[in-house]
Amino acid sequence: MAIKTNEGKLIASGLKFGVVVARFNEFISSKLLGGVIDGLIRHGASEEDIEISWVPGAFEIPLVAQKMANSKKFDAIICIGAVIRGSTPHFDYVANEMSKGIAKVSLDTGIPIAFGVLTTDTIEQAIERAGTKVGNKGYDAAVTAIEMANLLKMI
């Protein structure tokens, strides 16, 4: 008996994607969004198969991701934004609850949700991850969404 191995393909054609973008720290989020769109299009998605929803901040991402997932219109959802540490504990609360919320939506709905929200200590770290020194984490999230959408269709 052979071992069956499942692995999602990086082919986005025919798939529909929802993207939730936090407007807070928009100068970073817009670069991440560019990476998401680039990643999806390069792997065969059409612009008509991408729907983008902007939310005020990272804390609001899970609710809109849940609404998108429950609509059953999307094969995968991509969440992007930037939470940058400040001098108060606010960062910890927002990053923690947003992360848990996104994971809960994915587990509750069975829709893959790619986590492309930067949680960094400095603005410089965020800039590095939004298309400069460390690549674009939006692009990486798009590739993750494609792979997971295809993998879940196989299982």
Swiss-Prot record:
5-amino-6-(D-ribitylamino)uracil binds at F24, A58, F59, E60, A82, V83, I84, F115. (2S)-2-hydroxy-3-oxobutyl phosphate binds at S87, T88, R129. SUPFAM superfamilies: Lumazine synthase. One of its GO terms (molecular function) is 6,7-dimethyl-8-ribityllumazine synthase activity. Pathway: Cofactor biosynthesis; riboflavin biosynthesis; riboflavin from 2-hydroxy-3-oxobutyl phosphate and 5-amino-6-(D-ribitylamino)uracil: step 1/2. It catalyses: (2S)-2-hydroxy-3-oxobutyl phosphate + 5-amino-6-(D-ribitylamino)uracil = 6,7-dimethyl-8-(1-D-ribityl)lumazine + phosphate + 2 H2O + H(+). Belongs to the DMRL synthase family. This is 6,7-dimethyl-8-ribityllumazine synthase. It comes from Acetivibrio thermocellus (strain ATCC 27405 / DSM 1237 / JCM 9322 / NBRC 103400 / NCIMB 10682 / NRRL B-4536 / VPI 7372).
